[in-house]
Amino acid sequence: MRRQWGALLLGALLCAHGLASSPECACGRSHFTCAVSALGECTCIPAQWQCDGDNDCGDHSDEDGCILPTCSPLDFHCDNGKCIRRSWVCDGDNDCEDDSDEQDCPPRECEEDEFPCQNGYCIRSLWHCDGDNDCGDNSDEQCDMRKCSDKEFRCSDGSCIAEHWYCDGDTDCKDGSDEENCPSAVPAPPCNLEEFQCAYGRCILDIYHCDGDDDCGDWSDESDCSSHQPCRSGEFMCDSGLCINAGWRCDGDADCDDQSDERNCTTSMCTAEQFRCHSGRCVRLSWRCDGEDDCADNSDEENCENTGSPQCALDQFLCWNGRCIGQRKLCNGVNDCGDNSDESPQQNCRPRTGEENCNVNNGGCAQKCQMVRGAVQCTCHTGYRLTEDGHTCQDVNECAEEGYCSQGCTNSEGAFQCWCETGYELRPDRRSCKALGPEPVLLFANRIDIRQVLPHRSEYTLLLNNLENAIALDFHHRRELVFWSDVTLDRILRANLNGSNVEEVVSTGLESPGGLAVDWVHDKLYWTDSGTSRIEVANLDGAHRKVLLWQNLEKPRAIALHPMEGTIYWTDWGNTPRIEASSMDGSGRRIIADTHLFWPNGLTIDYAGRRMYWVDAKHHVIERANLDGSHRKAVISQGLPHPFAITVFEDSLYWTDWHTKSINSANKFTGKNQEIIRNKLHFPMDIHTLHPQRQPAGKNRCGDNNGGCTHLCLPSGQNYTCACPTGFRKISSHACAQSLDKFLLFARRMDIRRISFDTEDLSDDVIPLADVRSAVALDWDSRDDHVYWTDVSTDTISRAKWDGTGQEVVVDTSLESPAGLAIDWVTNKLYWTDAGTDRIEVANTDGSMRTVLIWENLDRPRDIVVEPMGGYMYWTDWGASPKIERAGMDASGRQVIISSNLTWPNGLAIDYGSQRLYWADAGMKTIEFAGLDGSKRKVLIGSQLPHPFGLTLYGERIYWTDWQTKSIQSADRLTGLDRETLQENLENLMDIHVFHRRRPPVSTPCAMENGGCSHLCLRSPNPSGFSCTCPTGINLLSDGKTCSPGMNSFLIFARRIDIRMVSLDIPYFADVVVPINITMKNTIAIGVDPQEGKVYWSDSTLHRISRANLDGSQHEDIITTGLQTTDGLAVDAIGRKVYWTDTGTNRIEVGNLDGSMRKVLVWQNLDSPRAIVLYHEMGFMYWTDWGENAKLERSGMDGSDRAVLINNNLGWPNGLTVDKASSQLLWADAHTERIEAADLNGANRHTLVSPVQHPYGLTLLDSYIYWTDWQTRSIHRADKGTGSNVILVRSNLPGLMDMQAVDRAQPLGFNKCGSRNGGCSHLCLPRPSGFSCACPTGIQLKGDGKTCDPSPETYLLFSSRGSIRRISLDTSDHTDVHVPVPELNNVISLDYDSVDGKVYYTDVFLDVIRRADLNGSNMETVIGRGLKTTDGLAVDWVARNLYWTDTGRNTIEASRLDGSCRKVLINNSLDEPRAIAVFPRKGYLFWTDWGHIAKIERANLDGSERKVLINTDLGWPNGLTLDYDTRRIYWVDAHLDRIESADLNGKLRQVLVSHVSHPFALTQQDRWIYWTDWQTKSIQRVDKYSGRNKETVLANVEGLMDIIVVSPQRQTGTNACGVNNGGCTHLCFARASDFVCACPDEPDSRPCSLVPGLVPPAPRATGMSEKSPVLPNTPPTTLYSSTTRTRTSLEEVEGRCSERDARLGLCARSNDAVPAAPGEGLHISYAIGGLLSILLILVVIAALMLYRHKKSKFTDPGMGNLTYSNPSYRTSTQEVKIEAIPKPAMYNQLCYKKEGGPDHNYTKEKIKIVEGICLLSGDDAEWDDLKQLRSSRGGLLRDHVCMKTDTVSIQASSGSLDDTETEQLLQEEQSECSSVHTAATPERRGSLPDTGWKHERKLSSESQV
């Protein structure tokens, strides 16, 4: 409370300034100026009062720095002159207030779990570096800046934020450093068609635009709206649509976001009960001169009399005139007060005598005595105050002073003691409390996300993002849940505190849930809703929802709970702002505060301090009070532009402010120490302190059994109450009814509500339904408890149980404005009117067997009711001639019964007892009734009916809804009297019904075997009482009971999300959805097979072609791969084929009707082919092409005889059809807006229909053409010969695409291929001259012209993100074919095993290695764990091992092909290994590494003898492949943009191709090198010898990755591991000179041996003679050593063994295995072993000599050898020293992005990321920024190839041949090198083993170098 000062005696002067200005105090010369107060007040005192030991200023500022009289011997003299007890010195407390009593104290020893402060205090070690100044001198917070994690960004102030927040356009660092030095801002992506874009770029659903809610957060979604939702009475609507209290209009304070409430205001609009501030603002008159600055400019406190006594400090005296003086001036003989009250007899002042002296009897003082101006002045010790007698002292009750203790306080004589609640601990200052447990976290809603911030560090993290409009917030610490409300979605949601498992809690019946509170003791959820003016409660999962408080509530906002006391508190900022409380069961409601409140927003409870705090956004203040509302006090009244929410923790307040977009803090007692925790937030909303002590433990009054309650158990004081969900009656003290028997049912557009008649409160609650957007009509069926409703926004009819369960859509097609609904509870039929289509329809109650009853002479039919007893239905029609009609429920006997004095006849109701028909007329403003035949018409209510809409009857009452009064009312159904209002202030009221269980039963013939009807049996007024009817589009047969099986003649069309049919057999046009039970995304092309009754369609979003029966059954996808944009589709019903065009791939393809035997027919010179039609009898197919040069073409149906028919005056030729009868070709052009025709050769061109707005699909049947139009959203018809008589077939059909006309009665015609497929083995395709046989893409046709090879022999296999594809090299058309492997996400690396015919691949999205057959079957995961980024993969087809690189883990691993026996081979000195390749015959393993030091390395297949081959002049070595014939390695460098090669030792290096764009992977076959390129999106090849003859094999392929060749020539040769796994139990690794056995890193159930032995062969399901091109599993004739290799006779697979293998004894000439006799293998091994021992000694000697010779001639000082020892394969400590090549600066900031997605154009100028790190990127950045120039080291250009000639050409420097290692390699390969020219004459021929493909192959000739 601010002190008010008057004109004081002795020149005391008060200078009070407004809160908005900074005071400048100037006192007179004879006065002392006190310190300026926190409220800006100035105080002047007489100068002689300074340093007199008296607190005259009230803040001791007049005594600061004064030298006071000497303290008594029993006291301690502080440095500031203060006297304290000596016993208080060095006790750890700052009693002097300058810490001088704690200086020079002996050091205090702290415990082991304590931290020693520099000031001598001891605090808990846990408090060290927790961001809180616990020591008092901040010595516990002098900490090193904490390190940010790898996924965090460090702000300039040292705080850490999430890395992805860097440069995201949102300031997340407190200093804004995360948004500095960012690249140019990227414009926000546009919103889609169903969204609205806010002013700052955010997208919201379009339905939220102009709905009256601030969904954008800046009101931009509500600006420029033509109309807004009307505000309530007592509210003012801002221009933006916001509703505020009407009293805030022209009150001088801008409450509207656009300040429109203060526009056009007169000079004064204040009432007689208000005071006008200088600013023009109006405040209550009672607030004038109350000591509070309510005007915010202090004008309400100016010129005030002294209306009350200010509160003086504890050591001050209150004068009668209100002045405060120091206690020492009391009874000092001087009139210090000015009114002599300090010297009056009432103060027991005794007369002064001259003998007074402190030396005599201590001057009569009880404690301290001092002489002041010659007189005795008695004073007291600290903790005491001088009594009125001026001599004695009494104890000061410090506990009565707020803020002395943080929580608890106990007073004692001359002292006090602070204490803390459970869960807190007293700090070293002995006054404040610190919470035990984890560091506190501020949890706050930020509209679009929910974040956590550390208040002492200003660091915050994201908890939940991508939210719509999160406002209210709370948490449940024990259950680790966070709850929030979203006022845009009108939902309450929850999630785990780690952000996972988001789920809806309350999803219906909310309008503006602005407050949320969790009862953590009883597990309940409470919330306020200012839209519905309610406070509700439910379980934590939203179950058992109950309206707790609803009466006398206006706009409840904030809510807080005190579960320990069973109390709920809330704020209400309606017309009468207040803060209220009640028990948590809603009882005991009471007002806490209702004065000096404007806009009470946030509310929080200090449980330990037993106080509440709230913010007032309009009053700009933070206040506190006791929990009963007493001791109310303003804590902060300055610097609060718009506080919204508040929380408290320990001694601090934290609040959010909308205006400053910040989180702030201050001391909860004084309001001082204000600090900005976070600013520059998006839109801070609710805030809470996340800490266990904010939810202290309490007694659960309901116990473990919910208090015995069947539903809700709610605390009530210290007891509890059993409560029922809203509407359910209580049947006992603890039990509720399980169902509702009768209730009023009404629609409110966005929800459907009920008012139970089982309870007395008549409060409405929402039926929990999803996606109700604009409900209008209602009805119900009590037999199955269903409620039905129509929705005119979604154009659907739905139903659900009365409790909201079992919700389903029953009719969702061909509805435009279903406004009326009626249930025939007798025959279970659903009737409805549609004002958009002007129809009345009926269906079964589940929506099946729908049919049109009345379609003529209807003009906006509205409501409908049925009377099953008489068999009639009644409806209102409020078109041009308003009327009420009736007809039989089968549409018979139609007649108008009321046609006069009607305007807008709305609701209808039937009184079945009195046989009356009631209706409401909104135009006539009446409710009337008449007999069921229209007679005896009478007005029931004719006044005070502004706009009645819905109408119903129940019992003796009639109920109706009124749009204008926004109410539900009732009256007596016979007299119209006794009117009452059931509910009011309900927006958008629609239909109304009473659900009950007393509908009269009616007998009907339809109940017996459906009346004999095959489909629909309807009630009828005819003598039989019923009639049979057929579903829409189907005719009733002559028997009057049976319907035809289906449509004979019909249109069928695609509408993107569905396929529909329009029957041409009936007299009206009505579309019917083909009930295919799948989700369609973008259905475009369509075709029909009338023979089997199937429809075919393409979906360009799902990339598939599908088919189903015309009744929707038997759906199947026939083409699922290799499609991009299938715009055209045609079914050859005669030839049983399906044809389609693909605009994305620019191809025309054909396949069998089941999708098999797929073939590309046309692929050259196509540019966006679209429509396609067939003429089987003529053998032609026609198609449109609307590319750059639009044209219409024709070819044979086998792709032959291609010709352009028309190529001029075409724009966008869309639809295409053939008129076989008149031999005409017809097409629709959307650009020229014409439908044209020509003959079948393109001649005689003429226009049929013009203009047409945007035609798309075109078809023909009989004498008419039909077309779809995008712009009119309609289907049109015209005469096919003249184009005249254009009519509208169906309208209001958005998304119209292709269309076909079908007459199933027409004969199909003759099949050119006959009954035996023309003798073709695969495809038989018609052509003008007959037919031709064709093969699926990539397979060759044999010489007989009829038979196809079973499969391709040589082909490319490549990966492209989500696909694996094949390109045959056997045929000339290099078109790709998808390998149908399922579940591909992000495939990177590939390899193939020719033995089992399986493809192996890595998927870095799933982090797995998988394999599958080439037909897509038998897909299985080989390695499914422990992978991060598997970039490289290689199959050892001999040893049956699998190798891979892992860039994420920097390892090279191996396993068996089935994933077993997994082992890490190399895990050191690797920095992002990429490609990998194996050479089993030589036992070599090669890989590239493009880390910090790019290199290419080689090792043995077990990882030993590791060697760096190339480490200079490398950038990003990506792909790697081996040429097994020429013994060379090839690689691509994506940084240097070239393809290079070298020999197997890294020598004879040669640049093959320069200036390639961005190569990724490569492979070799025959004389060609093939590679994939990211930038050109293509597969290319060059001659491997010259680097010339560059060709593009395949273009326009997104996301190209790995590529390999599958060929019988690739996986040849063998080694010792090829026979029975080398005798190893687990892993067998071939090496350059021997082989080794190895054990897996994780042992399995089998014992592992490192010594080769006899291992029984594993049984095989398939014989090796059938599949395997390598050695079969047979026991070795010799036991292999792990260090030596024995020459022995092994099996040979003819054609797979080289001469060198044969010379080494690795090949046998017989295909039959020769098993060893018992013991023979051992004897032979002994003999051979002895021989080899001698040879080994000789070899070692020779090797030593060679080594010395080599060393003398060649030394590589930069190369260190890596040695590996069996079995651990640990590397030696010797490091490989390689020259480091620097990477770009941003290289290390990039990560491997695994999510799939489209690749954008890569250009040399724009590629964002280093390709090897992020294989997926769609962003743009400067490519040159990523590359750094690397200096060439001038290496040798070498060319080492095996030539067909007998010479070797080596271009090298003169010193190059001194390399003895290279010379040795050349000599070795002279005997091995085979010619790669397949055209040469073979030296021998032999049969090849079957590799899975049947083939014949010519062997290559051999020549010596």
From Swiss-Prot:
Residue ranges with Low complexity bias: 1676-1686
Membrane-spanning segments: 1726-1746
Result after altering W1186S: In SOST2; impairs the interaction with SOST; loss of function as facilitator of SOST-mediated inhibition of Wnt signaling; has no effect on AGRN-mediated MUSK signaling; retains the ability to bind AGRN and MUSK
GO MF annotation list: apolipoprotein binding; calcium ion binding; coreceptor activity; protein homodimerization activity; receptor tyrosine kinase binding; scaffold protein binding
Disulfide bonds: C27-C44, C34-C57, C51-C66, C71-C83, C78-C96, C90-C105, C110-C122, C117-C135, C129-C143, C148-C160, C155-C173, C167-C182, C191-C203, C198-C216, C210-C225, C231-C243, C238-C256, C250-C265, C270-C282, C277-C295, C289-C304, C312-C324, C319-C337, C331-C349, C358-C369, C365-C378, C380-C393, C399-C409, C405-C418, C420-C433, C702-C713, C709-C722, C724-C736
GO cellular component, one term: neuronal cell body
Subunit details: Homooligomer. Interacts with MUSK; the heterodimer forms an AGRIN receptor complex that binds AGRIN resulting in activation of MUSK. Interacts (via the extracellular domain) with SOST; the interaction facilitates the inhibition of Wnt signaling. Interacts with MESD; the interaction promotes glycosylation of LRP4 and its cell-surface expression.
Domain EGF-like per the UniProt entry, residue ranges: 354-394, 395-434, 698-737
Topology class, membrane: Single-pass type I membrane protein
Name this polypeptide is given: Low-density lipoprotein receptor-related protein 4
Top-level taxonomic group: Eukaryota
Alphabetical list of SMART domains matching this protein: EGF, EGF_CA, LDLa, LY
Residues with attached carbohydrate: N264, N498, N719, N901, N1077, N1415, N1467
Leader peptide range in chain numbering: 1-20
Locations listed in the record: Cell membrane
Cytoplasmic side: 1747-1905
Region annotation Disordered: where it falls in the sequence: 1659-1686, 1852-1905
Stated family: Belongs to the LDLR family.
Listed result of changing R1170W: In SOST2; impairs the interaction with SOST; loss of function as facilitator of SOST-mediated inhibition of Wnt signaling; has no effect on AGRN-mediated MUSK signaling; retains the ability to bind AGRN and MUSK
Residue span of motif Endocytosis signal: 1766-1769
UniProt tissue specificity: Expressed in bone; present in osteoblasts and osteocytes. No expression is observed in osteoclast. Expressed in several regions of the brain.
Main location: membrane
Biological-process GO terms, alphabetical: amyloid-beta clearance by cellular catabolic process; dendrite morphogenesis; dorsal/ventral pattern formation; embryonic digit morphogenesis; endocytosis; enzyme-linked receptor protein signaling pathway; generation of neurons; hair follicle development
Outcome of mutating R1277H: In CMS17; decreases binding affinity for AGRN and MUSK proteins; does not enhance downstream activation of the MUSK signaling pathway thus impairing clustering of AChRs
Organism: Homo sapiens (Human)
Segments of skewed composition (Basic and acidic residues): 1882-1905
CDD domains: EGF_CA, LDLa
